[in-house]
Amino acid sequence: MKVRSGVKKICKKCTIIKRKGVNRVICEIPKHKQRQG
């Protein structure tokens, strides 16, 4: 899980989801997981 000020998709399988007011990137590749904060 990477914590970043801005999140963006790394590959085609990445999806951006807003959960409890926090933007997150969910992907099959664990390395691509991100959250904004």
UniProtKB/Swiss-Prot annotation:
Alphabetic keyword roster: Ribonucleoprotein, Ribosomal protein
Keyword Signal assigned: no
Superkingdom per UniProt: Bacteria
Molecular function GO terms recorded: structural constituent of ribosome
GO CC list: cytoplasm; ribonucleoprotein complex; ribosome
Regions annotated as coiled coil: none
UniProt-listed PROSITE patterns: RIBOSOMAL_L36
GO biological processes: translation
Annotated InterPro entries: Ribosomal_bL36, Ribosomal_bL36_sp
Pfam entry (one): Ribosomal_L36
Family membership: Belongs to the bacterial ribosomal protein bL36 family.
Protein name in the entry: Large ribosomal subunit protein bL36
Taxonomic source organism: Mycoplasmopsis synoviae (strain 53) (Mycoplasma synoviae)
